[in-house]
Each structure stands twice: as structure tokens, then as C-alpha cells.
């Protein structure tokens, strides 16, 4: 699956055409009020491009929350998004109370030029994800014929398909892979994601450094193994470093995270790194706590001293930060996935913050810096560095699967150039 050879919105002739666009409007809500409109704002450039270039209509479809294939308009309706869109676009948005069926098809068949139409939550139909569960917890499975009909109805709502929902690209859902139209293009959000991940995965600048944090080795095995085939340097930090250090250095790790499953393959990982000539850097000192709480007693430890019984490492220490900075200073491309400490608590945030400062420094000297979604993207928001790095991915699961070397169904389904 080539990331750089996919049809993009700017290569489409949209004049006079009905555009059906998959967006990510899965926004946080409280009492049917949107609490953060970032994802809606992010979709505006693609929508505006279509309107500015004479599209007849832009029909928007999205999921919201996890209604699991059951209509729950009281809790998961996209109706509040229509009002938000109206104010961001400065034009009327027609909200439809369903996403498929004859009424919806009729409303989208012959719209006035420049119409913007928002469909109701795709996941009110079990045919979107293929499975779900009813309110009593019984499992629901969509029938193949009904999935076909659902996809056919969505396909009637436009002449051209645009996908701008990178965060759902790793899911083979109907709205991601089942729209049967001759031209299927990425929107501008998706395009930027694919451009940056292509820089890392298809033709990287070197030296290429991957920084991998997070808690469990077992969750990151695929990621580590795939990246060892791509990078020159790797930093392994966060909770999973304790498993490596215990196995490799026989370090006393006290009550720190230890991953039994992951421990079994530490030697394999090191052998692969050795074979590929990849240098892996681990932490050398730690900020410790006497319990897993924000107000825990704080201590220090090194690999040599070990972490005493009952204490746990929750961050890396100042010597480690210096060591990481030296490795980062050489890099021309950095991909960072996973924090290196419990950054949500100030006492254990210094390591991740120091890393972020170095990432910003690297970016300003021309290094390409890519932040994988999820917790690492949350760090960017916390320290206000989203515009001080090259790219912050909007998709936690999708970016992880790309870095693991997997094919993303939602990207694979787009037209090739």
C-alpha cells in the first residue's frame, strides 16, 4: 500500500458534482453541548475547497461515540454539530435525521448548488461497523445483504467520495471502504497524514530516530519490530523500559511495571537491533514513587542502584534526559509514539516535557518531527507545541497500525494515482 500514490482532493474536478465526504466529527459532548470543536474545525478546509470550487453539494457523514448499531439520538446525535458547522462555515447546514434510506436519498439527489448536508450518526446502523450490541448487552451482527444495501444507499448520496477521517482509517467500516463510486480521494487532513507517514515509512531522511514509550512491551512488539527495519536509532522509554532493564541488566525494579509476556521477547528484539545495526538507548536514571498516586513520596534511582522494594519508577531522571538529547541532536527525522513518564502528574512529567523541548528544538533546526496520536498528541496539547513540531497525527490507533507496518483499509480503498 503506497501512501504517497493516492488520489487527493486537490486533484479532483468537483465542479457541479455532489461530494460525499467521510469526516471525523467524533467530538466530546456534555448534555448535547460540544465541549471541544477541534475536529469540526479541522474538516473546514476540505469542505470549503469543495464549495469554493463549485461543488453542487457536500454531504458529510461521521460517527459519534459508540451507540453500537442502535439509534440513540438522545445521547449520540450529530445534530449539535450542524449548528457548530453553520457558525464555522457561515452558511446553512441541512441536518438529516438518518444517514441512509429513501428520504435521505431524496434529500441528496437534487440539491441546490452549494448545499451542505450533515447526515445522522452512521453507527445508529449496525451495518456501519458490521457488529454491535443492543441496550441489554446482546450481541448484534449485521447480515451481508443488509450491509450491501447500507453501502449502496450511502453511495447514492454523491458522485465523488472524499475521505478525511484518518482516525478511523484502520477500521474496515462501511463508510470507510464500502462507498462504490469511481473516484475516491483523500481530503486535506488525510492527505497531510499520508504525506508525513510516507516521509517516515517510504523514504526516510537519515539518521532516523524512533522514540517509543508507553507501558507494555507486549502492546508495542509489532511496532518495535517494524521500526527496527526502518530506523538508525531507537529510544525505548516509559513503563516498558523496566521490562528491558530487568531482563538485560538484571536491574532491581521494585514495584515498577514488569510485562511477563513482553519479557520473553526482549532478547529477540535486541538480536534484531544488533543485526540491523540499530542502536537502542534506554533510561539510566529514574524518578520513583512509593505508590501509584499523584501525591506519592518522590525518590531517585539509577540502573546501578536499582529501585527499592515497594517503590516504582514513574519517570526518567536528569541523566537520561541528557542522554536522550544527545541522540536527538543527530537526527534528521524523529517519530515519537508514547510518553516516557506519567506526564499527567507534575512530579513525573519532567522527562516527557524535556523530550518535548528537544523535539521542538530539533524541529526548529529543520528535523522532521512526527508525533503519533493518542497520549503523545495529548502531550502536545498540554504543552502547547502542536504548531512547533512538523506533524501531530490525529489518529492514535491508525498511526500506530501504520507504524506497525499494517495496511489501513480506509487508505487502501482510495483510488490510486
UniProtKB/Swiss-Prot annotation:
CDP binds at residues 214, 219, 238, 338, 340, 343. One of its GO terms (biological process) is gluconeogenesis. The modification Phosphoserine is found at residues 2, 4. The keyword Metal-binding applies. Mg(2+) binds at residues 215, 218-219, 375. It is found in: Cytoplasm. ADP binds at residues 214, 238, 343. ATP binds at residues 215, 220, 239, 313, 344, 375-376. The modification Phosphotyrosine is found at residue 196. Keywords: Acetylation, ATP-binding, Cytoplasm, Glycolysis, Kinase, Magnesium, Metal-binding, Nucleotide-binding, Phosphoprotein, Transferase. Pfam families: PGK. Belongs to the phosphoglycerate kinase family. This is Phosphoglycerate kinase 2. It comes from Equus caballus (Horse). The lineage of its organism: Eukaryota, Metazoa, Chordata, Craniata, Vertebrata. The gene is PGK2.
Amino acid at each position: 500500500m503506497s501512501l504517497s500514490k493516492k488520489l487527493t482532493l486537490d486533484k479532483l474536478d468537483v465542479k457541479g458534482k455532489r461530494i460525499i465526504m467521510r469526516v471525523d466529527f467524533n467530538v466530546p459532548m456534555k448534555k448535547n453541548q460540544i465541549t471541544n470543536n477541534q475536529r469540526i474545525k479541522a474538516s473546514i478546509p476540505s469542505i470549503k475547497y469543495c464549495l469554493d470550487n463549485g461543488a453542487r453539494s457536500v454531504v458529510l457523514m461521521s460517527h459519534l461515540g459508540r451507540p453500537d448499531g442502535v439509534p440513540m439520538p438522545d445521547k449520540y446525535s450529530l445534530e449539535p454539530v450542524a449548528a457548530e458547522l453553520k457558525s464555522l462555515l457561515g452558511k446553512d447546514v441541512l441536518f438529516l435525521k438518518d444517514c441512509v434510506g429513501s428520504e435521505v436519498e431524496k434529500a441528496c439527489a437534487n440539491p441546490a448548488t452549494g448545499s451542505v448536508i450533515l447526515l445522522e450518526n452512521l453507527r445508529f446502523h449496525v451495518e456501519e461497523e458490521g457488529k454491535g450490541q443492543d441496550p441489554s448487552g446482546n450481541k448484534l451482527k449485521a447480515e451481508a445483504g443488509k450491509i450491501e444495501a447500507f453501502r449502496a444507499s450511502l453511495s447514492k448520496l454523491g458522485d465523488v467520495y472524499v475521505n478525511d477521517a484518518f482516525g478511523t482509517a484502520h477500521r474496515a467500516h462501511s463508510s470507510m471502504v464500502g462507498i462504490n463510486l469511481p473516484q475516491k480521494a483523500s481530503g486535506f487532513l488525510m492527505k497531510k497524514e499520508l504525506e508525513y507517514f510516507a516521509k517516515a515509512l517510504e523514504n526516510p531522511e537519515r539518521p532516523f530516530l524512533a522514540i517509543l514509550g508507553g507501558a507494555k512491551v507486549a502492546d508495542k512488539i509489532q511496532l518495535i519490530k517494524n521500526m527496527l527495519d526502518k530506523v538508525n536509532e531507537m529510544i525505548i522509554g516509559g513503563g516498558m523500559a523496566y521490562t528491558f532493564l530487568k531482563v538485560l541488566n538484571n536491574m532491581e525494579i521494585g514495584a515498577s511495571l514488569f510485562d511477563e509476556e513482553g519479557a520473553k521477547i526482549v532478547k529477540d528484539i535486541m538480536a534484531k537491533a544488533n543485526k540491523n545495526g540499530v542502536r537502542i538507548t534506554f533510561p539510566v536514571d529514574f524518578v520513583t514513587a512509593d505508590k501509584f498516586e499523584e501525591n506519592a513520596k518522590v525518590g531517585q534511582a539509577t540502573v546501578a542502584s536499582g529501585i527499592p522494594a515497594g517503590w516504582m519508577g514513574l519517570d526518567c531522571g536528569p541523566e537520561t534526559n541528557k542522554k536522550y538529547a544527545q541522540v536527538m541532536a543527530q537526527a534528521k527525522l524523529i517519530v515519537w509514539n508514547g510518553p516516557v513518564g506519567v506526564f499527567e502528574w507534575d512530579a513525573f512529567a519532567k522527562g516527557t516535557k524535556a523530550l518535548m523541548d528537544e523535539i521542538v528544538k530539533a524541529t526548529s533546526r529543520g528535523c522532521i518531527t512526527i508525533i503519533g496520536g493518542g497520549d503523545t498528541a495529548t502531550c502536545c496539547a498540554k504543552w502547547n507545541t502542536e504548531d512547533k513540531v512538523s506533524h501531530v497525527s490525529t489518529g492514535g490507533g491508525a498511526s500506530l497500525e501504520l507504524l506497525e507496518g499494517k495496511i489501513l483499509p480506509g487508505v487502501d480503498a482510495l483510488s490510486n494515482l
